[in-house]
């Protein structure tokens, strides 16, 4: 569960290292974002000479959350931390690589490019 002011790690090579959630998209009073949801975030930490700079306001899709999510078969999945992937307005990732595993729920939300770039889908 990601809410306003949550700090996320970045799971791609866009150049950002830490994101600060500004807004959860999808409804006027929406409080939380889960895996596959889009947030608006500010870049709090970035590497030099990268595609995104510190202070940029970007959109990101949540790919890992520390809060477990239930699956239809009764199992649960959770990750060690909260991570996101920086995306553009066409919902395509800005980076060309994804680091670490991502959840299978991204497939249902139509983020196929992220699924194909990820080294492991859990």
UniProtKB/Swiss-Prot annotation:
It comes from the Bacteria. Binds to 23S rRNA. Forms part of two intersubunit bridges in the 70S ribosome. This is Large ribosomal subunit protein uL14. GO terms for cellular component: cytosolic large ribosomal subunit. It holds the Pfam family Ribosomal_L14. Keywords: Ribonucleoprotein, Ribosomal protein, RNA-binding, rRNA-binding. InterPro entries: Ribosomal_uL14, Ribosomal_uL14_bac-type, Ribosomal_uL14_CS, Ribosomal_uL14_sf. Part of the 50S ribosomal subunit. Forms a cluster with proteins L3 and L19. In the 70S ribosome, L14 and L19 interact and together make contacts with the 16S rRNA in bridges B5 and B8. GO terms for molecular function: large ribosomal subunit rRNA binding; structural constituent of ribosome. SUPFAM superfamilies: Ribosomal protein L14. Gene3D superfamilies: Ribosomal protein L14. Transmembrane segments: none annotated. GO terms for biological process: translation. Belongs to the universal ribosomal protein uL14 family.
């Amino acid at each position: 569960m990601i809410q306003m002011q949550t700090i996320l790690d970045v799971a791609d090579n866009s150049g950002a290292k830490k994101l600060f959630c500004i807004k959860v998209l999808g409804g006027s009073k929406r409080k939380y974002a889960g895996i596959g949801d889009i947030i608006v975030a500010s870049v709090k930490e970035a590497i030099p000479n990268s595609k995104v700079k510190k202070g940029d306001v970007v959109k990101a899709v949540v790919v890992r959350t520390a809060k477990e999510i239930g699956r239809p078969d009764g199992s649960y999945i959770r990750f060690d931390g909260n991570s996101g992937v920086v995306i553009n307005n066409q919902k395509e990732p800005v980076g060309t690589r994804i680091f670490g595993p991502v959840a299978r729920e991204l497939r249902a939300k139509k983020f196929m490019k992220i699924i194909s770039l990820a080294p492991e889908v859990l």
